[in-house]
Structure formats: structure tokens, C-alpha cells
From Swiss-Prot:
Protein family per UniProt: Belongs to the MDM10 family.
Topology with respect to the bilayer: Multi-pass membrane protein
Domain of life: Eukaryota
Membrane-crossing segments per the record: none
Coiled coil spans: none
Compartments it resides in: Mitochondrion outer membrane
Protein name as it appears in the record: Mitochondrial distribution and morphology protein 10
SUBUNIT field: Component of the ER-mitochondria encounter structure (ERMES) or MDM complex, composed of MMM1, MDM10, MDM12 and MDM34. Associates with the mitochondrial outer membrane sorting assembly machinery SAM(core) complex.
Domain remark from Swiss-Prot or TrEMBL: Lacks alpha-helical transmembrane segments, suggesting that it resides in the membrane via beta-sheet conformations similar to those predicted for other outer membrane proteins and porin.
Length: 448
């Protein structure tokens, strides 16, 4: 479950038209969120508020052996008045959904974020963004300031995001703590996104790290034929025949530590279906670290609107070690008790639909006389109950599970109870059945 501040930060990206699809670090983000979702530990309570359209606060209290907490503040130069901030109105998909599909390249500077489901997810219907992008002043010069103080450790973290142009953005993150070298560390990232490709340069004071990474898109909506049709040139019929409803992406990264004189690199590729794809949304990635010999493959699929699954396979060419992991999330429109009894989420919505009249077979007498039956009076039209949309959410919660080759099992149930958003989870070690439970936690969020 995403924290409130991360939800507001994603809303800031959506209001300014910035998409993270072209970032190499998010190449396999879909499978990572489906498999490596965090397990709550202990008890954590969060109280947050979007006090003004430009300012948000969050207070957190934790009890994991010792009592600690944090205080967070966020300021956005872009007004976020249209963002649902009350915990009883925040769409659960924006906080809990893991599968993340790609946006159309033509949506650069448009409305890539949906308050209904969060990131676009392929076949799941999207609602129009509530913020009118044309009414936001200086959205290409927007900025975001974020700070968080952890108590009683007195650890301070801060982040600044500054937009200089529609394609150029700078992000600076810093952490201040006495136990760190020189009392803290800072990471600076320069992002340049042109839609068809994206380039990032980074520098970290921890080890004097210098890095460069990039991602290039081709095929699908990134092809020349499709881009020309979006610009009004080219034949729509020929474009439709040549179009591939998926996008290929290839990229890599290189980094070098100026203090420890060491470096590294990796290469990666991804194929993901586009929102216009009418079939099953899927994402497949392959990353290779030639220096360390690591090969990583992932495959994620949105089998149903309420079911997403992912697998990951890692292999090392030098040591012949391998590791695998699987994960899934299952959305339900039933309460936890009804969900455990077993029922597909769509059954409740379909059970209220009346049966439609079937076509009557020709009578035996008519068949013998080689004629049709006499016409019967037309039956009264059947009224089909419409699916309720106002006052009732499509889903009430989500069940997440993962299993790795080490037989580590993670289970999480996330949902909403009245005005509280909760996450209840546990970690189980199947290799130690005598003491299987490794962690157990409950996280509760409330925002206004």
C-alpha cells in the first residue's frame, strides 16, 4: 500500500503531465510491485491531510519493538484541489494496484494519470482526469518540495523536484544522519524525456557515484507510421494494418564510483501492450548484468480486471545459482469473510441481471409443412439493471500473495473500513514450520 505522500507526489506528476514510463529504473516496476510488495510490521498509524491545494502534511506513529514516528510536509507549486484527499474518497486502485500499463506516447503533457485507478492498467476502464491541464499556470515550470523528519532518530530526508521545460526535470534527494559518512548523502538526477526516448544522468555523494542511463522505444505507437498518423499524415487504414499494439523498449545504464574506483553496467529490454490493445495486458522484461553475470527475466499479466500475476526468474552465469518468485493480487468486491468463502468478484455483479429471452425453436408441425411458425406477439422488453457506479465502489479490497524459491510466503489483505484504509499482512517461512511466522503487522491510514 502506497503512503499518502507518495499518492500526492504521483498526483503531482499527473497534473504536470510527467510520465515515468521512459525511466530505465522502472523497466520492471510492474513485476517488482506484484512480487516485492512490502509486508506491514508491527502497528503503524498514519494521519494525513491535504490542508490546501498546495500543501500536505502527514504524521506517522510506529510500534515495532520500540515506539517511533515521523513528520512529513509537502508543497506543490501546482494546485491539487481536484485530487481526492479524504480516505473515504481516495480510489483504492491509486493506493494499492500493482499492475501498471504504459501510456500512449501522444499523451505527453496530457492526462496520463487517472484518479480512479492510478496508473493506466490496460483494459480496466479509465475515467477522464479531473484537472484541466490547460488551466494550470506554468505547469512546465512547476516544482515540489518534500521533507520528512524521523523521531527519535533525528534522521531528516528531503526531496526537491523542479521542472524546467516539458521534457526536462531535475530531482534532488538528500538524507541527513550522524551515522552516515560526512553526516549525510545526496543524490541528484537530471531527467530528459522526449517521449520516444528518455535519458537520465545522476550523481551521488556516497562514493562519488556518476551514472548515465537511458531507454529507447520502438514499435507500436513509437513507430514512424503511427507517429505520422498522430500528426495527421499517412493513411489511417494502412496504419491500422501495420500497427502493433505493444511497445518495445531497450536501454541500459552505466555507473562509476570515483572514490572506490569501481563501476558497473546493465542492459535491459521490455515489451508491454498498449492501452489500445483489446487482448490481455502483459509486460515482459529481460535485464542482463554482463560484469556480474546476472540474468533477470520477468513476466506480468493482467488476466482479468480483478486478477494480476507475475513471475520472476534470476540466473547467474558464473555460479549457476538461480532464484524464482511468483506473485499475484486478487481484487474482490466482497468483505474479507465473504472473500475467504470463495467467489469470483464478478459474480455478485452478474447475479442481479435478469435472464434474456432465448430464440424459440420451430415447432414440429411447421417443420412437417415446410413453413415457419405463425408470428407471435413481441414480448415486453426486459429491463437490465444498470451497474451501480455512484456511492458504491467496484472493489472493496485486494488480496496479495507471493512465494519465492526460499519458500518465503507473504500474504497481505488491503482494503477500506469506513474512513480507514488498512493493510494487514504476515510473512511465513515454510522451511521452519515449527515457527513459521516471521512478521505480522497492521497499517492504518486516515486522511482528510
Amino acid at each position: 500500500m502506497r503512503e499518502f505522500m507518495q499518492y500526492v507526489r504521483n498526483a503531482f506528476y499527473g497534473a504536470t503531465g510527467w510520465s515515468e514510463d521512459n525511466s530505465y529504473k522502472d523497466l520492471n516496476v510492474t513485476a517488482r510491485e506484484l512480487i516485492d510488495f512490502p509486508l506491514p510490521r508491527g502497528i503503524r498509524l498514519s494521519l494525513s491531510s491535504l490542508a490546501t491545494p498546495h500543501f500536505a502534511t502527514s504524521y506517522q506513529l510506529c510500534n515495532v519493538g520500540v515506539v517511533d514516528g515521523s513528520i512529513s510536509y509537502l508543497h506543490s507549486s501546482v494546485p491539487l484541489a481536484a485530487v481526492p484527499a479524504q480516505s473515504n474518497k481516495i480510489p483504492l486502485g491509486a493506493l494499492m494496484r500493482s499492475y501498471r500499463g504504459l501510456h500512449q506516447l501522444g499523451s505527453r503533457g496530457g492526462t496520463p494519470w487517472s484518479w480512479e485507478t492510478g496508473p493506466q492498467i490496460g483494459t480496466i476502464p479509465q475515467v477522464p482526469a479531473v484537472a484541466d491541464m490547460g488551466q494550470i499556470p506554468n505547469k512546465d515550470k512547476s516544482s515540489l518540495l518534500y521533507g520528512r523528519l524521523y523521531l527519535p532518530q533525528s534522521l531528516l530526508e528531503a526531496m526537491v523536484i523542479k521542472r524546467f521545460s516539458p521534457a526536462l526535470q531535475v530531482q534532488i534527494s538528500a538524507v541527513s544522519e550522524q551515522s552516515l559518512r560526512n553526516g549525510g548523502t545526496m543524490l541528484s538526477v537530471v531527467q530528459y524525456d522526449r517521449g520516444k526516448y528518455g535519458v537520465e544522468g545522476l550523481y551521488s555523494t556516497d562514493g562519488g557515484l556518476l551514472g548515465l542511463r537511458g531507454l529507447y522505444n520502438f514499435g507500436g505507437d513509437a513507430s514512424v507510421a503511427v507517429m505520422s498518423s498522430q500528426n495527421g499524415t499517412g493513411s489511417p487504414e494502412s496504419t491500422e494494418k501495420e500497427r502493433i499494439y505493444g511497445r518495445f523498449s531497450a536501454g541500459g545504464e552505466m555507473y562509476y564510483g570515483t572514490l572506490n574506483k569501481s563501476g558497473g553496467m546493465s542492459l535491459g529490454a521490455r515489451f508491454a501492450t498498449l492501452p489500445t490493445h483489446k487482448g490481455t495486458p502483459l509486460t515482459a522484461t529481460l535485464t542482463i548484468n554482463p560484469l556480474m553475470g546476472n540474468i533477470n527475466t520477468t513476466y506480468a499479466v493482467l488476466a482479468k480486471d480483478f486478477l494480476a500475476m507475475a513471475t520472476r526468474m534470476e540466473f547467474n552465469a558464473y555460479s549457476y545459482e538461480s532464484d524464482w518468485a511468483v506473485g499475484l493480487e486478487l481484487w474482490s468486491n466482497r468483505r474479507p469473510a465473504g472473500f475467504l468463502l470463495g467467489a469470483e468478484p464478478s459474480l455478485d455483479l452478474e447475479s442481479d441481471q435478469p435472464e434474456l429471452p432465448s430464440k424459440k425453436e420451430r415447432s414440429f408441425q411447421a417443420k412437417m409443412e415446410w413453413r415457419l411458425d405463425d408470428p407471435e406477439p413481441e414480448p415486453e422488453p426486459v429491463k437490465i439493471a444498470e451497474k451501480p457506479t455512484e456511492g458504491k465502489e467496484e472493489y472493496l479490497g485486494v488480496f496479495k500473495a507471493r512465494l519465492s524459491s526460499n519458500l518465503d510466503l507473504g500474504l497481505v489483505w488491503e482494503g477500506r473500513a469506513k474512513s480507514l484504509i488498512f493493510s494487514l499482512g504476515t510473512g511465513v517461512d515454510l522451511q521452519r514450520l515449527g515457527e513459521p511466522f516471521r512478521s505480522l503487522g497492521l497499517e492504518v491510514q486516515y486522511s482528510s
